[in-house]
Amino acid sequence: KIKRQEELTIYFYNAAIKNGWFDEKDSEAALLVKKDLRPLEDIIDTMNIHAWLQECIHDAEGRYAKLITKLTVTVPMIELEKIAFEFGKLHTVGKVSVQDAYKFFDDIFLNGMPCDRVNIITQQDNSCFSWEQTHDIHAEYWLAFQGYPETYYKLRKQVMLGMLDGSGLILESPDY
């Protein structure tokens, strides 16, 4: 999940460079992208796994929030939503059950530590799968950079829609 979060941050950064929203010489923006994407098992602190993972999550969430908040100053939200959708299409779920689609979502989105129990399944059958978020684990990162937590959810929804593209499945979620 951390790796996917880093991929999403890089995807937005590269799109910003390509579209001229950031200059490649903008060192502040470049610092928001983690270049070292080695497998976690190669860099994990096995003596303190829980704290190490929490720090990685905090770092990844914070850099993503700061990058997107920086972009929202000059880039229309519709453009950022298009980028999020395209990122989702890179990770399409294909023709899967609703349960498998949820698993794909759960595998790609960083929602804190497993012990945070952010998503609770509320219904599952062959035609419908629903869950509720028990608390907003992302808002603190966005607020820290004077961003709007709703931005995270708007972009996440577009990633999810991109992931479902061509699957025949429909995502119903609140508009933020």
Q: Positions of the model-derived regions?
A:
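Short, hydrophobic/π-rich interface segment
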Residues: 127-174
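Short beta-strand
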Residues: 120-123, 172-176
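N-terminal accessory segment detector
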Residues: 1-124
